[in-house]
Amino acid sequence: MTTISVIKVSGHELDDPTFLGGLTAALRGFQQPLVLVHGGGKEISAAVERAGLQIEFVDGLRVTSPAVMDIMQMVVCGTINKRIVTALVNAGVKAIGLSGLDLGLLRCEPYRPAGRDLGRVGEVTAVDGAALLHLLALGWMPVIAPVALGATDGLSYNVNADMVAEAVAGALAGAELVFVSNVPGVLVDGRVVPALTPAAVEELIANGVISGGMIPKVRAALAALQRGASSVRIVNLAGLHDGGTRFTHGELSE
């Protein structure tokens, strides 16, 4: 099998009503096997508000009570996932919508950063890579919503979509991970840096060249490398096929 690409799109991007059409057109042109991981976005918060429940975030992670989990699962698995799958199928792509609950695809433990209890927020501990490879061998594109199965309690958990994408790419040996963003890549002096190593990233952060909202993006890229991805790119839709900034383990050739 040729190189697998795991493509992650955020809920923020999906909040743009024009984004899905552009994404569908771009993915239709790919020749290699693809796995798509997506986030949630404003629709989850809107549904939580309509239910009269509190919206709370800690370091970008949604505090998820059992009631909020029910709503999150309904929106991200039932509405957003199926919207994406419908668009892809209508474009001729053999897409299949899944969450981490299906086939026990993603298993997790409660995520407790710095000891904080975020409720039903999980951290992926296992991915059924064999199941994904089987679906890919059939010529299908798995579209994965970021809900995982608790490894010890059997409950559903809300998982950060970046973490899901990192874990999936790591489970598919040699896979490339592509983070689709609203920027064309890491910019230095207004130009996209085509390639970076972990050492170069740390130097650019220390020097203040990489700052603000780009820092968590590059940190996620480095985390994906550590989890086993062969390479990682940060791109926008225009650069989805071969553009953006590529992160690799080793030294870059001159």
UniProtKB/Swiss-Prot annotation:
InterPro entries xref list: AceGlu_kinase-like_sf (IPR036393), AcgluKinase_fam (IPR004662), ArgB (IPR037528), Asp/Glu/Uridylate_kinase (IPR001048)
Enzyme class of the recorded protein, top EC level: transferase
GO cellular component term, pick one: cytoplasm
Keyword line: Amino-acid biosynthesis, Arginine biosynthesis, ATP-binding, Cytoplasm, Kinase, Nucleotide-binding, Transferase
Site positions for Transition state stabilizer: 8, 217
Family that this chain belongs to: Belongs to the acetylglutamate kinase family. ArgB subfamily.
Protein name: Acetylglutamate kinase
Organism: Chloroflexus aurantiacus (strain ATCC 29366 / DSM 635 / J-10-fl)
